[in-house]
Amino acid sequence: MAVCRTISIDTGNEVILVDTGLPAGFPDGAPEETAPIYIGKSICEYMDALAALGYKPEQVTKILLTHKHGDHSGELKSFPNAKIYVNAEEIGADELKDIPNIVPVEFTDGAYYNFPESQKIADGVYFIKAKGHTNGNSLIIAENEGLFYMFQGDITYVDEALYANKLSVVFDDLAAARETMDRVREFIRHQPTVYCGTHTPQGYENLEAKRVMDLDNPVPTVLAEIDFSQKEDSGKYVCSVCGYLYDPAEHDGVAFEDLPDEWRCPRCKQPKTKFNKA
């Protein structure tokens, strides 16, 4: 289940977001047993969730984008006063076109523990290069009360992959993803780390419980119950990589199934096999 949650960091002087989730109105995924990823159903729109925490868009001062994909960057335009920090290698991505106030991160502050390249964003908040999932993938670490909170974007989709030391989601650079995974695991073994994934319920549970990741003692997996009986077929398909929605009504009525086999996602260039029913 491809849950995508994002994080707010309130320093007392600033309100900092890590990613901004899917855009408002994004369609629910249609569960299919053969689909590579189930995008899931919306629980709450991102901006509504932020308002429920007591924050207005104008209060947000910085947004730290782990990577370009639409399920992490969907609401960037909703924050008029925020500087948007993103790895300079992601600049120019279709998902970031026409986004104002982007600050390219050049990792000018040297090493952060065993990670060779980092940039300090605020007191106790660090932007760290973590290439692999995308060429510009990054992770964020926030230090608080002796703990290291790691907001890792899509280095893993689920904690089970981290425990098993397996690469699960790599789109751009397999070798770099392996190096990043090795560094993440090394860091966790030596520093008390709360591992906050965006695509698993364990991310929220780890954060709420301040649960320090122990690689030798995995937390038991609780499988979600999914109803595969399905709703009516809308004819729409969504890219499981970048969130691009294919709607036949916007393409002269051409059904997704009738597109040529060599057709690619207009945004991220992934093949048809990466699309799920919406």
What is the predicted function of each stretch?
Residues 1-48, 139-153:
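Conserved beta-strand hairpin/beta-sheet module of binuclear metal-dependent hydrolase folds
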Residues 38-55, 59-71, 83-131, 135-207:
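Metallo-beta-lactamase
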Residues 232-235, 261:
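Short metal-coordination and nucleic-acid-contact micro-motifs, chiefly zinc-binding Cys/His arrays
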Residues 239-242, 265-268:
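Short cysteine-rich clusters marking metal-coordination/redox-active sites
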Residues 251-263:
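Short linker/helix segments within small regulatory modules
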